[in-house]
């Protein structure tokens, strides 16, 4: 696909931005175009621009849970930097989709509000957490969500009430809608125990996960028959390597970039894990990492 972006795009953009430098996996070639969007009106203009000019785009939050192709991305990567934060005395928090989900979890707990403690340590944005319905410790992002503001592919701003959205385990309706989550509102409850819960969660996460390694977070959804990490370990795959990609020695549901890993290394390791776990345990593991091909029109 050959195209160029005229200068009327609402934000200053970069060309050939290395995606490995802005993702937690540390993998990915250059994006043909890259832009940071900091306001909802600019997101509306940017998505409408892409729609009118038939330019493929990818919405990026904090760069976790995404695996870009080694060749990069033949389109526009839109980094969501909408990071507003407002709250009232009743525990209603309105937050931009580009805000750190981990920071939101620690801030709310520190101020005595319960409901998002589990977010502490999850390396993604609020928008990404809603998109994937991220969760841990028996809680999910959707549990305390009351509304989501979304910009569709034609730049229209839509307000969704939680009651009209169908969330399931690690899935949201936004995975099937073109556009971008731009903000959300959470209803939290006052709790004197919130801070201690949050500190316990982050302490446990640091001890049981490869906290500082280059990874995209948990690779597989937990199947009905058990925890993905335990099944992978049961299959004898802990520390298995393909190229620079390796199954973590700390937590088997993490693939880490142990060196100069490529996207193909990671994809090959994912397939190996799925095939081996299926053969040895009968369980089918479904990846929750979003692989982004170079050309989205070819897959």
Swiss-Prot record:
It catalyses: UDP-N-acetyl-alpha-D-muramate + NADP(+) = UDP-N-acetyl-3-O-(1-carboxyvinyl)-alpha-D-glucosamine + NADPH + H(+). The keyword NAD does not apply. Cell wall formation. It holds the Pfam family FAD_binding_4. The lineage of its organism: Bacteria, Pseudomonadati, Chlamydiota, Chlamydiia, Parachlamydiales. It comes from the Bacteria. The active site is at 170, 218 (proton donor), 288. GO terms for cellular component: cytosol. GO terms for biological process: cell division; cell wall organization; peptidoglycan biosynthetic process; regulation of cell shape. The keyword Oxidoreductase applies. Its main location: cytoplasm. Residues 26-191 form the FAD-binding PCMH-type domain. Keywords: Cell cycle, Cell division, Cell shape, Cell wall biogenesis/degradation, Cytoplasm, FAD, Flavoprotein, NADP, Oxidoreductase, Peptidoglycan synthesis. GO terms for molecular function: FAD binding; UDP-N-acetylmuramate dehydrogenase activity. Its EC number is 1.3.1.98. Belongs to the MurB family. InterPro entries: FAD-bd_PCMH, FAD-bd_PCMH-like_sf, FAD-bd_PCMH_sub1, FAD-bd_PCMH_sub2, MurB, MurB_C, MurB_C_sf, Oxid_FAD_bind_N. PROSITE patterns: FAD_PCMH. This is UDP-N-acetylenolpyruvoylglucosamine reductase. Its cofactor is FAD. The gene is murB. It is an enzyme of class 1 (oxidoreductase). It is found in: Cytoplasm. Pathway: Cell wall biogenesis; peptidoglycan biosynthesis.
């Amino acid at each position: 696909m050959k195209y160029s972006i005229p200068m009327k795009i609402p934000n200053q953009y970069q060309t050939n931005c290395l995606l490995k430098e802005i993702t937690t996996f540390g993998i990915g070639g250059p994006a043909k175009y890259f832009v940071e969007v900091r306001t909802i009106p600019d997101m509306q203009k940017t998505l409408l621009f892409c729609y009118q000019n038939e330019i493929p785009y990818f919405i990026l939050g904090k760069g976790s849970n995404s695996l870009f192709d080694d060749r990069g991305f033949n389109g526009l990567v839109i980094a969501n930097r909408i990071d507003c934060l407002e709250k009232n005395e009743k525990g209603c928090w309105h937050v931009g989709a580009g805000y750190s989900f981990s920071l939101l979890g620690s801030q709310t707990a520190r101020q005595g509000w319960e409901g998002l403690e589990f977010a502490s340590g999850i390396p993604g944005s609020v928008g990404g957490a809603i998109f994937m319905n991220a969760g841990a410790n028996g809680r999910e992002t959707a549990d305390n969500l009351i509304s989501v503001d979304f910009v569709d592919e034609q730049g229209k701003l839509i307000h969704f009430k939680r009651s009209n959205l169908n969330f399931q385990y690690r899935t949201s309706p936004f995975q099937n809608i073109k556009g971008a989550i731009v903000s959300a509102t959470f209803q939290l409850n006052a709790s004197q125990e919130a801070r201690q819960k949050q500190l316990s969660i982050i302490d446990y996460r640091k001890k049981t996960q490869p906290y500082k390694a280059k990874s995209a977070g948990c690779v597989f959804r937990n199947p009905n028959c058990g925890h993905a990490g335990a099944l992978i370990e049961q299959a004898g795959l802990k520390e298995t390597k393909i190229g620079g990609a390796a199954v973590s020695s700390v937590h088997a549901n993490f693939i880490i970039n142990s060196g100069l890993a490529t996207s193909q290394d990671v994809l090959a390791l994912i397939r190996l894990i799925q095939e081996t776990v299926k053969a040895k345990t009968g369980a089918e593991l479904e990846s929750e990492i979003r692989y982004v091909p170079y050309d989205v029109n070819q897959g």
